[in-house]
Amino acid sequence: RPGRFDRQIIVPLPESDERLAILKVHSIGKRMGQDVDLDTMAKATPGMSGADLANLVNEAALFAVRRGSTHIERIDFENARDRVVLGASRESLVLNAEEKRATAYHEGGHAVLATVLPHSDPLHKVTILPRGMALGVTWTLPAERHTYSREFFEDVICKAMGGRVAEMMVFGSLNSGAANDLEQATGIARRMVREWGMSDAVGPMAWSGQQQVFLGEDLMTSGREYSDETARKIDEEIGRILLEQEK
């Protein structure tokens, strides 16, 4: 609180160049294979702290030991990153042939859109090996950005919808596998409309939904800063964005 400390030091998470430097430090003394590209791994680990990156290198070394190798290869870093971010592989999970096929087409839908959309981050890896709660994952290499355009968010939503659309095109029906994609897409569309002023119909207004009084929302109000008409318009705009990007 004010008065106890005169200086407030903000330590942000490392960016790509800084992550590369951290990975190099923790790789000292470890034998690296010829295919290891720490620069690519630095780009593929946004949001990781220095401790996370140290753990990543240690996990990669453990994967190499389990393979009986004297060198850490690229596959070890990939497996380590998947484990740190998603969790351990679920070898006990047995999918039937139809589920594997659906997962493959689902991730393929994401991958195709990541490749062709002009504002999407470049495709890095696609897997249908179950890890954590995911049956498959499509990885991209995000650029270091500090501001984001409406077109970028639209492409993120479109890519999220890609798995669902691919399943519909191939199987003619939908399943519950797109739940996380829909949650991500809806969350982005909601913030585009409510917080970032990216809806022409609603206009340049922002409602974060985080303004609360002491001990919770003011009991004398509904906790909402806008009218029922505006709420209806917001819902319509969120739905419009999602449907447009699904097409």
Predicted features by range, described:
Residues 1-11:
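A short helix-turn-beta junction within AAA+ P-loop NTPase domains corresponding to the substrate/partner-engaging
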Residues 92-102:
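Short pre-active-site segment immediately N-terminal to the catalytic Zn-binding motif
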Residues 47, 104-105:
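Alpha-helical architecture
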Residues 11-78, 83, 87-88, 160-168, ...:
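Conserved C-terminal "switch" segment of AAA+ ATPases
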Residues 102-104, 111-247:
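Soluble catalytic regions of large protease machineries
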